[in-house]
């Protein structure tokens, strides 16, 4: 011990470089590697290596501090020697140090590059030799027990501990191997008395051994529990093997027998029966509590809950069918006639095979309720599958059984809900199908909607063919924007909007009665006159269907309930008339009557088709000084912009016939605007209206306020046919217009237009632009004669001569 002390004999108050340590306390006689990364600590090590100095290894109080102050460093550390130093590529330094003797810092030196401190070596107080001997033996014995419980310490450490004779070194070496917190290790380092240090080490080990023994008991208990579980599993497997030899248990036998009985009673196809029996056989060989058994049981439940060849009796009374359709829906005569034709053919052929009916029309015209009426009139069970926003193919075809929580697709789920194999299956909003990386559900529907293929529809979950050939499929859509192969499998039945008379009749027959009941009104408490009903339709709704109208009637009913309750008198009732309609319905939302109040130059009323029915389209044109440019505004699409260009070119080509001087185009700009500016517009059918506005603004002849028009134009002045004629004519009638110009080629479509619409409008077929202008302008255009001005040849100066030669003058 004296020799060890003489090695570190340095004058008291010597100056040492100090690298603050984090998460480690270095004890005397301890060799430990350190990784130094902070700049101050690296510079301290460089200073040590210059003169082969000693280093003071002191721990900082808070390891989280990157830039500690002297106050953040413990005052007692260990003077050590640097045995090895290695600079790493990332700038950090790996250093191997050996602890020497305890030292107490007296004062930190002023050094900005790194910490330096004056420190005095701490002399150990040895104490009585016999007591130290006893404490040493007790510590070694306790350490042996500690090593047995703490597997992290290698057994070789015990050999080196047994060879230590010095009590102080023994205490420090054992302390360095204990799993203690930094403050506890620092207490041991600061303890100068050897006997006290040994006692503290012994006490720390005593506490740690107690904790380790509890940990060991917990580990043993968990191990025993696991062994017990494994043993139970092994015995269960043996029990299953014995049960397989002797026969199933009562519960298992009852479940299997019940499933087998259901399978035998169900009218499966041969493939489905074989599959169900194979799954039942698999279920019998499984543990009832296993996860796989639950999957098989769910599969069999689905197989047994789907209707297999379980038909309901289809009604063939077509008179009853017509009566039901007429009772549920007013108007829609062409649609109902087409449905009845389809039903007649099905009854005659006694099978469903044929085109899939698809009802296409704006919202609120009764497409979904028509599907319900068809089911009611044929006696089929009704099931509806909403396809709006469906993006995953598995929604239609189902998920494979390998996935957790898998189940059949919506088609098979719908068949389970229908409880018969020949329901009416309504595929609602089929045009709203989406597609993404999970697949295209519209492609999955191709098999469902093909009469030649749907007899063997294969759901991914069932994995067997299911016959959908007896199902009557009806689709609904707002537009025909759907994949062509899907569209090819359908027969489109157009459901156009309702006329004003039809809306009045629908309100009287269905909507008023429904809302009176829904709002708790009694019979005789609420009444609305026909004139008030017409005003409600004209000034408060602007739609093809009747949804907004129903909301307005519901609003009137609520106001009536409030008024009756406020009066509080028995027999109070509310009558809505044209005079008091504003009181209950509020301010008028729409204008009804002519699109324009007077004949205006450059303002033409066009007709547009939208998903919610027809709309009036006001097309405005103005002429202003410029260089012959044409500007378009109103959020027009490419096709509509091209219509403006075609109209401009045609007007330029026939300028004199329209009474327009050709030179006018070089001096004037034309601005065409289609309000409302925020609404996107596209399509070629506004071509005739564009030409009319441009001719009107260049000639100064006003356009008739009571004329609306629709049609595509060509550069030769022909008017081409358009689509959505019924919706456009209904919009003109709603707008109070008297005359409508339509393409001559659309004259054949007038057969499908209701008589009251044809009576309310003067429909004028036109085939050329001249016909359009003749009816649209307040007076006819007057042609003018125009001669192109003769081109003036540039004068060429004669060359001047000077004497006999020619001279060029510059």
From Swiss-Prot:
Domain annotation Lon N-terminal: ranges: 16-209
Domain (Lon proteolytic) ranges: 598-779
Subcellular location per the Swiss-Prot or TrEMBL entry: Cytoplasm
GO biological process, one term: cellular response to heat
PROSITE patterns: LON_N, LON_PROTEOLYTIC, LON_SER
Binding of ATP, residues: 361-368
EC number: 3.4.21.53
Reactions that this protein is recorded to catalyse: Hydrolysis of proteins in presence of ATP
Subunit structure: Homohexamer. Organized in a ring with a central cavity.
Family: Belongs to the peptidase S16 family.
Annotated protein name in UniProt: Lon protease
Gene: lon
